[in-house]
Amino acid sequence: MKKINITTARKLFSKGEKIYVLPNKVALGNPWVSPSLIEKINGETFDYIINAYCAYMPRELGTRCAFYVND
């Protein structure tokens, strides 16, 4: 997986690409927390999905999101 910034993630999401999101303090290979797949479903916006994800994210794992795509 390749790490990308939020601007690139937003552009790829609008094109219909699969984006993975993870709290910023969690390592990518962590066995307890795995990346969550986000994709366009039912017309939900990128910001709506990310805001919902961040609202329920434990603060011990980070306060921001890290975005990834498959190589």
Predicted regions and their residues:
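Acidic, low-complexity, intrinsically disordered interaction modules
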Residues: 19-70
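Mixed-charge, Lys/Arg-rich low-complexity intrinsically disordered regions
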Residues: 1-15
